[in-house]
Regions:
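Phosphate/dinucleotide-binding and metal-coordinating scaffold of catalytic cores
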Residues: 1-312, 316-440
């Protein structure tokens, strides 16, 4: 039976096996179970002896891969993978995955961290960033057979290594430092056309605003190569060692992996976890008070900026030695406000991915949400009312200045329509806060 060995940095963790019937099983290595660095690969795959055969095995590894069937088909075509199943795809592109996971054939070992790369010229960088237009997945251009990465999510993206001011393609098992996101483009729906051609600018703006309001988000910058404009987001699952000679992978997983769920149920409306389940889970965090506070604060932020994609795969935890965990920075934040009007969507169509408590059922429609719904949710969750009031009051006080500060920090060629659309609607919803909490 074919096997893939799972590594965390240079530590052998266990073996992923694909059975004859297509099922996936996982077994922790004895030396990993005995190691002082031992931690579960996933909180849905607790440390234990023997084979783990639950659905959580398939779902954990499947969630390391891009969501899009189109991108998966490109991987099959590019590397002649046997199928679209996780084992077969990760056999080809599992060298640098989300978190600390590296998957290698049985005959390959990692005795020490290796750092090797190829510096990219601007022309080569543009080639990597436009590879998807030629049906090449994740920027893995044909001339670079050694460049094999897996980046989860639905958006066109790749990952690259930043050395000083240079963008580089990593060689072998060398990690990447940044996720590189391309413009999403147009999404055609039955009743609307969503123009996300400015998604790079949109996400950059949202990350700046989140940081200005005290939320923990990764650093990001807009990069250009030829005619390509992309967003480079610093990976929080990577860290240089003290000497800055070796890049370490940090174990983490998203909430679908944590709960052993497939990505098909990442939305609460499809049966995935909502605020209550995640808040209950964060009670067990090594920084429970902070994480629960920050998570509730982020729910308010998503409402204010019209972020409709806050599903389970867009929240993650770091997995620490022994299996303790804590919340990672927030990520993948885009406002839907620039999509309003024209052939786009109406404000009444915008809904949060996770519902808030209301007098009757759940409230998801962004334009129908008021501060009272956050307070009602906090009450159901037994989240301290005084802290929820504090969060709402802080946003009421901070929003106007934060918007001004972000606007003055933007590059001169930043699209004004993105700023106007987000700012106008944020201030409109902010009015609901300021009426109750005051704002000067």
């Amino acid at each position: 039976m074919p096997k893939l060995v799972t590594w965390m940095n240079n530590q052998r963790v266990g073996e992923l096996t694909k059975l004859a019937n297509g099922a996936h099983t996982f077994k922790y290595a004895p030396e990993w179970l005995a190691s002082r660095y031992a931690r579960p690969l996933s909180l849905s795959l607790p440390l234990q002896r023997g084979n783990i055969t639950s659905d959580a095995v398939f779902n954990f590894f499947d969630n390391l891969l891009p969501d899009s069937p189109i991108v998966r088909d490109r991987i099959v075509k590019r590397y002649h993978a046997k199928s679209r199943q996780p084992f077969d795809l990760l056999s080809e592109i599992g060298r640098d995955s989300v978190g600390a996971v590296t998957l290698l054939p049985e005959n390959e070992t990692i005795t020490r961290p290796i750092m090797a790369w190829e510096k990219l010229t601007e022309a080569r960088l543009e080639e990597v960033l436009t590879a998807y237009k030629a049906d090449i997945p994740l920027g893995m251009i044909r001339e670079e057979n050694d460049f094999r990465i897996s980046v989860a999510g639905a958006q066109e993206k790749t990952a690259l290594l930043r050395i000083g001011n240079d963008w580089c393609i990593p060689k072998g098992i060398t990690p990447t430092t940044h996720i590189i996101k391309l413009p999403i483009g147009e999404i055609r729906q039955p009743n609307a056309t969503l123009d996300l051609s400015q998604s790079v600018d949109n996400e950059y703006y949202c990350l700046l605003l989140a940081k200005e309001l005290g939320l923990n988000v990764p650093d990001a910058e807009i990069i250009k190569a030829g005619n390509v404009r992309a967003l480079a987001v610093e990976r929080f699952d990577r860290r240089w060692n003290a000497e800055r000679t070796v890049l370490l992978r940090l174990p983490q997983e998203d909430m679908c992996q944590t709960f052993g769920l497939p990505s098909s149920v990442k939305y609460e409306s499809d049966g995935g976890p909502g605020i209550a389940r995640i808040m209950a889970f964060l009670m067990g965090s090594s920084e429970a008070l902070k994480d629960r506070y920050d998570f509730m604060k982020f729910q308010v932020f998503q409402w204010l900026i019209g972020a409709t994609d806050g599903h389970a795969k867009n929240f993650s935890v770091f997995i620490q030695a022994g299996g303790s965990y804590r919340l990672t920075p927030f990520y993948d934040i885009i406002s839907a406000f620039p999509l309003l009007g024209g052939t786009g969507i109406h404000i009444s169509d915008l809904k949060l991915a996770m519902g808030l408590n209301a007098s009757k059922g759940k409230k998801t429609a962004i334009d129908k949400i008021y501060p009272r719904h956050f307070l009602a949710t906090a009450k159901v969750l037994r989240f301290p009312e005084v802290q929820m009031h504090e969060i709402l009051s802080d946003f009421a006080r901070m929003i106007p200045a934060a918007l001004d500060n972000v606007k003055t920090s933007l590059p001169t060629d930043f699209p004004e329509n993105v700023v106007t659309a987000v700012e106008t609607n944020v201030l409109r919803l902010h009015g609901r806060l300021s009426r109750e909490y005051g704002s000067k």
